[in-house]
């Protein structure tokens, strides 16, 4: 993807000194521009499974309601990965994450990212420490 989450992820990966970062997205121009801006490798969307990498971070809406039966890559491609992260928080377990779990590949859904974003915003707006446990209970209770 090429939205704000993608940009944050790219900055984080760069800060952590990750090498060989690839980006792919359905919008050729936006993705190519993002790759140039952050000095990462660009892969055309229809070539994404012809590349060799270990970690997949899905920052597209593919898998989010109402596209819950879709994945950004095939099950066969997921088998080659060491780790899968999906930024989507709803549904809590996307098809991508469920597939990675079934294949015994390390994985993390966007649920915790959403919770941590909410906690940071709470502190930013209230100048108080967020009630993380209560926030998580509420999120679990209301998550579909």
Regions found by a protein language model. Name each.
Residues 2, 26, 89:
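Cofactor-binding loop segments of dinucleotide-utilizing enzymes, especially the Rossmann-like FAD-
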Residues 1-14:
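Glycine-rich adenosine-cofactor-binding loop
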Residues 12-20, 102-106:
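Conserved S-adenosyl-L-methionine
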Residues 38-42, 125-128:
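Short, hinge-like loop/turn segments at secondary-structure boundaries
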Residues 40-107:
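Rossmann-like adenosine-cofactor binding region
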Residues 16-38:
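NAD(P)-binding Rossmann-fold cofactor-contacting core
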Residues 83, 87-144:
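Adenosine-phosphate binding glycine-rich loop
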């Amino acid at each position: 993807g090429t939205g704000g989450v993608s940009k944050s992820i790219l900055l984080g990966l760069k800060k952590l000194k990750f090498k060989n970062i690839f980006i792919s997205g359905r919008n050729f121009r936006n993705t190519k521009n993002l790759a140039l801006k952050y000095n990462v490798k660009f892969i055309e969307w229809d070539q994404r499974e012809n590349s060799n990498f270990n970690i997949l971070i899905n920052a597209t809406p593919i898998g989010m309601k109402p596209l819950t039966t879709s994945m950004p890559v095939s099950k066969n491609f997921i088998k080659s990965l060491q780790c899968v992260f999906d930024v989507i928080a709803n549904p809590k377990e996307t098809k991508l994450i469920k597939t990675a779990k079934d294949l015994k590949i390390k994985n993390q859904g966007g649920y915790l990212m959403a919770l941590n974003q909410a906690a940071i915003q709470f502190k930013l707006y209230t100048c108080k420490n967020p009630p993380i446990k209560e926030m998580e209970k509420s999120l679990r209770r209301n998550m579909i």
